[in-house]
Amino acid sequence: MSRKPIIAGNWKMNKNPQEAKAFVEAVASKLPSTDLVDVAVAAPAVDLVTTIEAAKDSVLKVAAQNCYFENTGAFTGETSPKVLAEMGADYVVIGHSERRDYFHETDEDINKKAKAIFANGLTPIVCCGESLETYEAGKAVEFVGAQVSAALAGLSAEQVASLVLAYEPIWAIGTGKSATQDDAQNMCKAVRDVVAADFGQEVADKVRVQYGGSVKPENVKDYMACPDVDGALVGGASLEAGSFLALLDFLN
């Protein structure tokens, strides 16, 4: 089954609104047709208004880097999925290892967020991934599988088919170490197999699975050649317009 690739840049806690606007202006007119690939950037909350406004007449989609699982209320410092939808965001990244690690997010939190995101008409990009210790112990498939099952629990088959899963081995995020092509393929296939077990093969064949972890213009083509890798969630290489655009060269 042919799945449309999705390349998403995750700016993390970088860029002020002026820098975000300049980035979008630099890349927007150079992006390929949405028939070929979906392209998105995940901007910090303080940059979302500017980024969405700058991207609105282009094919560039915009993601939030997180949200809460309630729409309104006494949740100081949190971001409402309802307001993200009203602002014009397309995606919300949830379950990133930095959120799990530094902010103690649980699989249950991530599952609640996924449901809230869908309830507001947005699409979740659900992250999963194992530590170096888990990887070296040979338990990556089991660990990541449990994360995926928990994150998707209670969603409909239709919802799961439409979301994006991002496999990011924690040991490869921002470390300069990247998974081999075989590692990426095997783990993205394992993620898809969990979806097949929980929701059926037809859903698994539709869901898009990204690889993330030190993806750069030099290695993106190798990852995109893997049958079960449908895209990339990219950190460092998404901060400069030139390197971000170069990630799309795999299409040639």
From Swiss-Prot:
Pathway given in the UniProt record: Carbohydrate biosynthesis; gluconeogenesis; Carbohydrate degradation; glycolysis; D-glyceraldehyde 3-phosphate from glycerone phosphate: step 1/1
One BP term from GO: glyceraldehyde-3-phosphate biosynthetic process
Compartments it resides in: Cytoplasm
Record's keyword terms, sorted: Cytoplasm, Gluconeogenesis, Glycolysis, Isomerase
Catalytic residues identified in the record: H96 (electrophile), E168 (proton acceptor)
Organism domain of life: Bacteria
GO molecular function terms attached to this record: triose-phosphate isomerase activity
Catalysed reaction equations from the record: D-glyceraldehyde 3-phosphate = dihydroxyacetone phosphate
One Gene Ontology cellular component: cytosol
InterPro entries tied to this protein: Aldolase_TIM (IPR013785), TIM_sf (IPR035990), TrioseP_Isoase_bac/euk (IPR022896), Triosephosphate_isomerase (IPR000652), Triosephosphate_isomerase_AS (IPR020861)
Residues engaged in binding substrate: N10, W11, K12, G174, S214, G235, G236
Primary site of residence: cytoplasm
EC number: 5.3.1.1
Protein role: Involved in the gluconeogenesis. Catalyzes stereospecifically the conversion of dihydroxyacetone phosphate (DHAP) to D-glyceraldehyde-3-phosphate (G3P).
Alphabetized PANTHER family for the sequence: TRIOSEPHOSPHATE ISOMERASE (PTHR21139:SF42)
Family the entry assigns: Belongs to the triosephosphate isomerase family.
Name of the protein in question: Triosephosphate isomerase
Organism for this UniProt entry: Streptococcus pyogenes serotype M5 (strain Manfredo)
